[in-house]
């Protein structure tokens, strides 16, 4: 699914109107019918409904929804905010239709002072004040109205976006002046702001409603950001040949683990094997030998000369891919070995965990790295790598894109909607995964998965795409049996077979 900017959304509406053809008013009616159906699926007509409509087209949608709900037997009270006496043309027409229909319990057009209605538990608020066209924080009376709605016990459903939330960058927005919806009914496509963790408090559940905007425009229009879906991943997967053997399925090298962190090398190695690679060689300190040999008998072990740390670079000529970093430690000897390893590496590489922390502490080394590496930081690791001081998710995403460009590589920023930032500036969000995966070792599993895919011959971008989707899908399948609270990292590896089977259906 492509994610369009607010300007592109406007052009999509315009193109649909001109080429379907359909009037803007009839397109608004189509959207209102989809919105009404979605509301009626959630709330019965015994639920009192209060609609707050703004002066623009989002308000026009809300007025049309109010009319349709009232026709279906809902008790609807409507408040249209028209303080500047300037409604959009379609909003004005829907105001006229609503009044002429005489079905709503109450219609109030607010032009000066406003005495807000009592909002109570058991009521439904339809928020249609502002949509994706908003480009500045709410202030004054609208901000006060938002605060009043948020303080109520009523359920809130927002049309397209919660009022006050902008469709893209909210780094300078005012949190108190944004509606906190229980359900957001967004039209045609998700917006970029919906992919940011710090905006989830406003969105509630999200439903995307298909209002049949031009498929031709959507297909031919480039978007910087998109969401990876199951159909996209199915198209990328290569069938395993009947005559495949371990030599043809790739050999992966994992450099992982230090004293006390053998578990990281176990997790990465098991995940790598479960992702179908022909052979895995794990380079780890001597102290980890027995743990690794017992925990992962399928792996080939290569022991470092040191007892407790990674200290010597490995010749990668015989390997098809390398993953480095899980549980590695950050000693000075390991840091020196790491940069030497990355400089001499001749195969595709995944850089994770302590390897990222070492690079963050030696930023000058980052300019010496080969191109097309895949970096897999969680948010705090990215902050250290990129020198970010703000915790704003949008700024973090932009910095990840800048870093991908500067390093000529891929930044896979892990999170609920993991974001794959390409060196050309494109961003792909993952649609799988859940909060149960927020547990130690989950990233080590991801490193193993992507390393295996690289070793099997997938290009860097495809390995990262498939890897993060598989990782999240395994987590989604696992919580169906185990729940979120008890999920641990090794469960993700255990559910990889089911994830593959799902994609092969």
Could you tell me what each predicted segment is?
Residues 112-113, 161-167, 192, 307-309, ...:
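Short acidic loop-to-helix transition motifs that present clustered carboxylates
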Residues 123-124, 129-223:
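Internal gly/pro-rich beta-alpha loop/helix module
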């Amino acid at each position: 699914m492509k994610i369009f900017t607010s300007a592109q959304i406007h052009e999509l509406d315009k193109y649909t109107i001109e080429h379907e053809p359909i009037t803007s008013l009839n397109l608004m009616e189509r959207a209102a019918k989809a919105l009404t159906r979605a509301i009626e699926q959630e709330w019965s007509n015994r639920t009192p409904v209060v609609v707050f409509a703004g002066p623009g087209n989002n308000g026009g949608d809300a007025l049309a929804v109010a009319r349709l709900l009232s026709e279906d037997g809902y008790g609807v009270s409507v408040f249209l905010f028209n303080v500047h006496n300037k409604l959009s043309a379609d909003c004005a027409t829907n105001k006229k239709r609503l009044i002429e229909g005489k079905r709503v319990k109450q219609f109030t057009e607010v032009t000066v002072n406003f005495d807000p209605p009592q909002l109570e538990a058991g009521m439904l608020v339809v928020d249609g004040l502002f949509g994706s066209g908003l480009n500045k924080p709410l202030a004054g009376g609208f901000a006060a109205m938002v605060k009043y709605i948020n303080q109520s016990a009523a359920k809130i459903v927002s049309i397209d976006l919660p009022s006050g939330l902008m469709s893209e960058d909210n780094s300078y927005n005012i949190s108190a002046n944004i509606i906190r919806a229980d359900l957001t009914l967004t039209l045609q496509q998700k917006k970029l702001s919906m992919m940011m963790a710090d905006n989830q408090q406003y969105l509630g559940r999200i439903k995307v409603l298909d209002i049949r905007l031009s498929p031709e425009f959507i297909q031919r229009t480039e978007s910087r950001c998109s969401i990876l879906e199951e159909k996209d991943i199915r198209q990328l997967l290569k069938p395993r040949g009947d005559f495949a053997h371990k030599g043809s399925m790739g050999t992966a090298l994992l450099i992982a683990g230090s004293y006390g962190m053998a578990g990281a090398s176990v997790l990465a190695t098991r995940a790598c094997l479960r992702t179908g690679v022909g052979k895995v060689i794990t380079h780890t300190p001597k102290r980890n030998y027995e743990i690794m040999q017992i925990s992962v008998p399928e792996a080939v072990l290569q022991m470092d000369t040191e007892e407790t740390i990674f200290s010597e670079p490995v010749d990668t000529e015989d390997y098809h891919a390398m993953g480095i970093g899980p549980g590695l430690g950050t000693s000075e000897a390991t840091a020196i070995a790491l940069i030497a390893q990355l400089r001499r590496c001749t195969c595709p590489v995944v850089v994770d965990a302590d390897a990222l922390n070492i690079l963050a502490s030696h930023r000058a080394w980052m300019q010496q790295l080969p191109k097309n590496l895949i970096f897999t930081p969680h948010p705090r690791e990215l902050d250290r790598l990129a020198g970010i001081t703000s915790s704003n998710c949008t700024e973090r995403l932009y910095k990840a894109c800048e870093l991908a460009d500067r390093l000529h590589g891929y930044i896979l920023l892990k999170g609920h909607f993991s974001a794959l930032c390409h060196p050309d500036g494109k961003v792909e969000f993952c649609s799988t995964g859940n909060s149960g995966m927020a547990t130690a070792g989950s990233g080590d599993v991801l490193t193993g998965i992507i390393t295996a895919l690289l070793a099997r011959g997938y290009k860097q971008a495809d390995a990262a795409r498939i890897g993060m989707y598989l990782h999240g899908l395994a987590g989604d399948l696992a919580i169906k049996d185990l729940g979120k609270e008890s999920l641990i990292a090794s469960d993700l590896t255990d559910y990889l077979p089911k994830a593959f089977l799902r994609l092969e259906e």
